[in-house]
Amino acid sequence: DTILFVIKPQGWRTPVNADQIPQFYYIHKPAGSPAGYRFKGVSPTGPLPKSVDFPLYPQKEPDNFKAIMFADPQPRNQQEVDYVIREVVEEIIGTDAVFGVTLGDIMFNNLDLFGPQNQGIALIGIPWYNVIGNHDNNAEAPSEELSDETFERIYGPAYYSFDYGQAHFIVLDNVEWYHDKAGKKMSYRGGLGKRQMTFLTNDLADVPAEKLVVLLMHIPLLSTR
């Protein structure tokens, strides 16, 4: 199982779906996600196709641009999704920002609400990227590896990168899940695993030194606790 994705280069755009979510990836899970969980994962994709193609379209990208960032909307139910749309989304429809990002805790554990909130955010009319937070994982998953299956079905990979103008944006999943000493209850902490560190190292190796690098993640790198 894997997710293949393209790193959007400067001056190009990827397609977006009806919810303005960038479609820069291909999910390969022949058997799909494990069944039996409350929140659906990825459906079986079958065998890998002969080719996996990522369309890119040219676009103008100025050095100076605006982007919208917000974090922790955390709606628990449809009523709170409506609050997000009314109090936040409606205020920024018509913005001149070129894209937006939700920096994690898109939901408050009820992952069935991803869809309704995505539909609301799509009204802003710009590509919208998403970072995974601790409340966006499937709490029923038996391991960290399976905790983001629902997120992947909706948004694609939990870590990736893209260019816009003279900036390079790196999205990271820094929510590490682990079992308690009894091996039963799952808890989380901030951190990056070996695979992500390898991706980060390889990604930065191709970024010019003069380019601005922006890290996007949910849990702060430094804590006063």
Regions found by a protein language model. Name each.
Residues T2-P30:
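A short, solvent-exposed beta-strand micro-motif common in secreted/extracellular proteins
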Residues P30-A31, G41-P44, L113-A209:
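Extended active-site neighborhood of metal-dependent phosphoesterases/phosphodiesterases
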Residues S33-F114:
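N-terminal active-site segment of His-dependent metallophosphoesterases
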Residues N64, A97, G125, A209-L212:
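A general structural motif
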Residues N64-Q74, Q166-E176, V214-L216:
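Active-site-proximal beta-strand elements of phosphoester/diester hydrolases
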Residues D72, G100, D105, G133, ...:
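Divalent metal-coordination and catalytic microenvironments
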Residues Q74, I106-M107, H135-D136, V175, ...:
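Catalytic metal-binding/acid-base residues of hydrolase active sites
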Residues A209-R225:
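Long, structured stretches of catalytic cores involved in phosphate-ester chemistry, encompassing
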